[in-house]
């Protein structure tokens, strides 16, 4: 359990950083598909 408590925040931080990076890159190349007026 102690190993899980030490690795979970690291995995979560890497996951959120990767997700944010993918969204930023996608928005840079395809801005109209992500934020299109409804």
UniProtKB/Swiss-Prot annotation:
Protein source organism: Synechococcus sp. (strain CC9902)
Protein name per Swiss-Prot or TrEMBL: Photosystem I reaction center subunit IX
One GO CC term on file: photosystem I
Cited PANTHER family: PHOTOSYSTEM I REACTION CENTER SUBUNIT IX (PTHR36082:SF2), PTHR36082
Family: Belongs to the PsaJ family.
Membrane topology: Single-pass membrane protein
Keyword terms of this UniProt record: Membrane, Photosynthesis, Photosystem I, Thylakoid, Transmembrane, Transmembrane helix
Role description: May help in the organization of the PsaE and PsaF subunits.
Compartment(s) of residence: Cellular thylakoid membrane
Cited InterPro entries: PSI_PsaJ, PSI_PsaJ_sf
SUPFAM superfamilies: Subunit IX of photosystem I reaction centre, PsaJ
Membrane-spanning residues: 4-24
């Amino acid at each position: 359990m102690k190993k899980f408590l030490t690795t979970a925040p690291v995995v979560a931080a890497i996951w959120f950083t990767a997700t944010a990076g993918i969204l930023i890159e996608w928005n840079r190349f395809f801005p109209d598909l992500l934020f299109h007026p409804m």
